Curated annotation (Swiss-Prot):
Protein species of origin: Neisseria meningitidis serogroup B (strain ATCC BAA-335 / MC58)
Keyword set includes Ubl conjugation: no
Identification of the protein by name: Formamidopyrimidine-DNA glycosylase
Pfam families: Fapy_DNA_glyco, H2TH, zf-FPG_IleRS
Annotated binding of DNA, by residue: 95, 114
EC numbers on record: 3.2.2.23, 4.2.99.18
Subunit details: Monomer.
InterPro entries for this protein: DNA_glyclase/AP_lyase_DNA-bd, DNA_glyclase_Znf_dom_DNA_BS, Formamido-pyr_DNA_Glyclase, FPG_cat, MutM-like_N-ter, Ribosomal_uS13-like_H2TH, Znf_DNA_glyclase/AP_lyase, Znf_FPG/IleRS
PANTHER family for the chain: FORMAMIDOPYRIMIDINE-DNA GLYCOSYLASE (PTHR22993:SF9)
Record gene name: mutM
Reaction catalysis annotation: Hydrolysis of DNA containing ring-opened 7-methylguanine residues, releasing 2,6-diamino-4-hydroxy-5-(N-methyl)formamidopyrimidine; 2'-deoxyribonucleotide-(2'-deoxyribose 5'-phosphate)-2'-deoxyribonucleotide-DNA = a 3'-end 2'-deoxyribonucleotide-(2,3-dehydro-2,3-deoxyribose 5'-phosphate)-DNA + a 5'-end 5'-phospho-2'-deoxyribonucleoside-DNA + H(+)
Positions annotated as active site in the UniProt record: 2 (schiff-base intermediate with dna), 3 (proton donor), 58 (proton donor), 265 (proton donor)
Length: 275
C-alpha cells in the first residue's frame, strides 16, 4: 500500500506538470473504486484551472477555484504524467481507470489494479471534508513533537505500534514506516503506549521524521505496484532494517528479526534491541 512517502513522492512528481493548467477533458473508464467516481466529473472539471496541489495524510489534493479533487491511491494506485514532449501517450490498459487531460496536451493517468483507491470531488471547505477533519498532525510538521506525542500516549494502554499507526494520533505512519521507526528508536512494538517516557517519545518523533524524510528522498518503497509519476520505482526498500526481514540477522546485534501479527498487520522487530 502506498504510504506517506509514496504519496509525497507522487505529489512532487505531478505538481510541476499540472499546477496552473486548465482541464480540457476527463476520460472515465472505470467508476467503481472504493467509492464510486462522480460520473459527471468531466463536466465538473472541464474548463477549470488547477490552482495548487497538496497532500493531507495519504490524500492528494488538487485544488480548483471552487472545489478540491481528493485522490487516494488505495492499495495499488499510482498517478502517471504524460506530456506532449513524451511523444505518443501510452495506450491505457485495463487497470488505467481515469485520464485527466489538460489543454496543453498533458495527461494525468490514474492506475489502480485492485481498485481500492478513490477520486472524490468536494466543494466545501477542504479541512471540513469527513475524511480529513479528524486527522492528527502531519509527522513532518512542528506540531508532531515530543510534548504532543507524550500527551497523546499517556492515556493509551494499547501497543505503541498501533497508536503510531492511528491517523487520529499522527497521519501517514503506515506499517512499513512504523516498523522501521520503532526499530531505530529501540522501542518494542508491543510496549504499552502509556509506558513510554518523555525522552523515548522525543526519540520516536525524531526517528519517525528521519525515516519518512529518507523514504521521500529515495522515492518511497516499491514492493508491488507503486511507481512515481514518471513510472519509476522507489528504492527505500533497499534500506529496510527489519521490515520484511523475518529470520534474517538484525543489522545492529546480529540476532534474528522476528515477525508477529499485531493489529492484523505483519510486525517485524528485534527482541534484543527493542524493549
Amino acid at each position: 500500500m502506498p504510504e506517506l512517502p509514496e504519496v509525497e513522492t507522487t505529489l512532487r512528481g505531478i505538481a510541476p506538470h499540472i499546477e496552473g493548467k486548465t482541464v480540457e477533458a476527463v476520460v472515465l473508464r472505470q467508476l467503481k473504486l472504493r467509492w464510486q467516481i462522480n460520473p459527471d466529473l468531466g463536466e465538473i472539471l472541464s474548463g477549470r484551472q488547477v490552482l495548487s496541489c497538496g497532500r493531507r495524510a495519504k490524500y492528494l489534493l488538487i485544488r480548483f477555484q471552487t472545489g478540491v479533487l481528493l485522490i487516494h491511491l488505495g492499495m495499488s494506485g499510482s498517478l502517471r504524467i504524460f506530456t506532449p514532449s513524451d511523444g505518443r501517450i501510452g495506450r491505457p490498459d485495463r487497470h488505467d481507470h481515469v485520464d485527466i487531460v489538460f489543454s496543453d496536451g498533458t495527461v494525468m493517468r490514474y492506475r489502480d489494479p485492485r481498485k481500492f483507491g478513490a477520486i472524490l470531488w468536494y466543494e466545501g471547505i477542504e479541512e471540513h471534508h469527513p475524511l480529513l477533519e479528524k486527522l492528527g498532525p502531519e509527522p513532518l510538521s512542528e506540531a508532531f513533537c515530543a510534548d504532543y506525542l507524550y500527551a497523546r500516549l499517556k492515556a493509551q494502554k494499547r501497543a505503541v505500534k498501533l497508536a503510531l499507526m492511528d491517523n487520529a494520533v499522527v497521519v501517514g505512519v503506515g506499517n512499513i514506516y512504523a516498523n522501521e521507526s520503532l526499530f531505530r528508536a529501540g522501542i518494542s512494538p508491543h510496549r504499552p503506549a502509556n509506558r513510554l517516557k518523555k525522552k523515548e517519545c522525543a526519540l520516536l518523533v525524531e526517528t519517525v521524521k528521519a525515516v519518512l524524510q529518507r523514504a521521500i528522498e529515495t522515492g518511497g518503497s516499491t514492493l508491488r505496484d507503486f511507481v512515481d509519476s514518471d513510472g519509476k520505482s522507489g528504492y527505500f526498500q533497499q534500506e529496510y532494517t527489519v521490515y520484511g526481514r523475518h529470520n534474517q540477522p538484525c543489522p545492529r546485534c546480529g540476532g534474528l528479526v522476528v515477525k508477529e501479527t499485531l493489529g492484523q498487520r505483519g510486525t517485524f522487530y528485534c527482541p534484543n534491541c527493542q524493549k
